[in-house]
A protein has these predicted regions:
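Structural preference for solvent-exposed beta-strand-turn elements
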Residues: 1-150
Length: 150
């Protein structure tokens, strides 16, 4: 753009802007919202939930652990929390899909439970390092076995 094509513009105060805006949900916040609601006692409503493969996988894991989760719309969830000690052992492995955030946070949640759990993921997640989570948990007394040293 040449100087002759340049136009200067100075914003000026105008009338107040009134309205509503709805921003998309956030994946990281959605994982955490599901987990915190599941560990709370009573019913929680999550609005602004980002529905995607990763967040659906995290919700499915909590359902396998005995938490009732409803989806009245793609952007909301109703979670019937069971409290810190209300999770139930799953007879099957808990599949986190490709959700690294979900798996890492679940490792911490499950380390404090009175039952053993197996977390699995897809091929991509299975290659990612987990030591930055498993080592501190082991230092706090958790018994964690990982595949292929990771």
């Amino acid at each position: 753009m040449s100087d002759s094509d340049r136009k200067d513009w100075t914003p000026r105060a105008g009338a107040p802007l009134l309205g509503r805006i709805r921003v998309p949900g956030d994946k990281s916040v959605s994982h955490r919202a599901i987990m915190l609601a599941a560990l709370a006692e009573g019913v929680s409503r999550i609005d602004g939930f980002l529905e995607g493969e990763d967040t659906r996988a995290t919700a499915a894991v909590f359902q396998r652990l005995g938490v009732k989760i409803e989806a009245p719309s793609p952007q909301s969830r109703i979670v019937h929390g069971v409290g810190l000690r209300g999770l139930r052992a799953s007879a099957e492995a808990l599949d986190c899909g490709n959700a690294g955030t979900g798996m890492r946070l679940l490792a911490g949640v499950l380390a404090g439970q009175a039952f053993d759990s197996v977390l699995i993921g897809d091929a991509s997640l299975s290659k990612r390092p987990m030591r930055r989570v498993t080592e501190p948990l082991a230092l706090m007394g958790a018994r964690i076995d990982t595949a292929d040293g990771g």
